[in-house]
């Protein structure tokens, strides 16, 4: 999870740092609604994905909506069609902000209460971590990525957590998003090959409108 300064400098130069959404783009999206197909999803995730398409906030790029409350994510084609859905493992601690400077710290120094998956809108791109793995970098500055599930510590039971029917046991990581390896290879990697994309991580503590200030649910004239 710890990031080399050279990687951070490159990421900042490419504009890959995460941030809070402040305004939608001016161009119209191809679809007025996101198409979840037969995938079950919360009303909040559906409404948010619909807003992405109606506002064109994804700028014609592939996008992911991560529902932290339900510990699941949805990968969409640029036109709003669902490419795939999966359970996900998230940061051990509840919370919507990363601790300042956490990307510079060694894993051993990160306390349990600091292991959060931040909420927000992030421009994401495929790349390599500090080893040899390919990952989807979500926030370089805070060393948050989406990657294949880590199975090097059997005691953490990460595969079992992903397979369980409840999101209650999906909190185990230092903040990164873990998905099944097959899902990463078949859905995430092809979606982001040759292109950047947007990752939206919905908050679990802060109000949705406090993170995405331009968001308006369908049929509403007020910020949620």
Name each region found by the language model.
Residues 114-224:
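Exported/periplasmic cell-wall-interacting domains
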Residues 1-5:
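N-terminal secretory signal peptides that target proteins for export/translocation
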Residues 44-157:
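Gly/Pro-biased beta-strand-loop elements
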Residues 29-43:
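N-terminal, Lys/Arg-enriched amphipathic/low-complexity engagement segments
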Residues 9-22:
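Bacterial N-terminal signal peptides
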Residues 39-43, 60-63, 67, 174-178, ...:
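Soluble non-cytosolic domains of exported or imported proteins
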């Amino acid at each position: 999870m710890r990031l080399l300064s050279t990687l951070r400098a490159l990421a900042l130069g490419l504009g890959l740092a995460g941030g809070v959404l402040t305004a939608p783009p001016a161009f119209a999206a191809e679809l007025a609604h996101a198409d979840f197909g037969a995938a079950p999803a919360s009303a909040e995730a559906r409404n948010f994905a619909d807003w992405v398409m109606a506002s064109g906030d994804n700028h014609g790029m592939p996008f992911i909506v991560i529902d932290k409350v339900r510990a699941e994510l949805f990968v969409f084609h640029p036109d709003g069609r669902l490419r795939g859905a999966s359970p996900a493992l998230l940061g051990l601690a509840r919370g919507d902000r990363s601790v300042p400077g956490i990307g510079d710290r060694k894993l051993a120094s990160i306390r349990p209460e600091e292991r959060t998956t931040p909420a927000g809108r992030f421009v994401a791109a495929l790349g390599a971590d500090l080893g040899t793995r390919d990952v989807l970098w979500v926030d370089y500055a805070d060393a948050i990525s989406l990657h294949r599930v880590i199975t090097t510590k059997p005691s953490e039971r990460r595969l079992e957590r992903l397979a369980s029917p409840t999101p209650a046991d999906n909190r185990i990581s230092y903040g990164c998003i873990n998905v099944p390896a097959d899902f990463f290879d078949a859905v995430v990697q092809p979606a982001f090959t040759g292109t950047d994309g947007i990752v939206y991580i919905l908050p679990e503590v802060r109000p949705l409108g406090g993170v995405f200030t331009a968001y308006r649910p369908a049929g509403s004239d007020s910020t949620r």
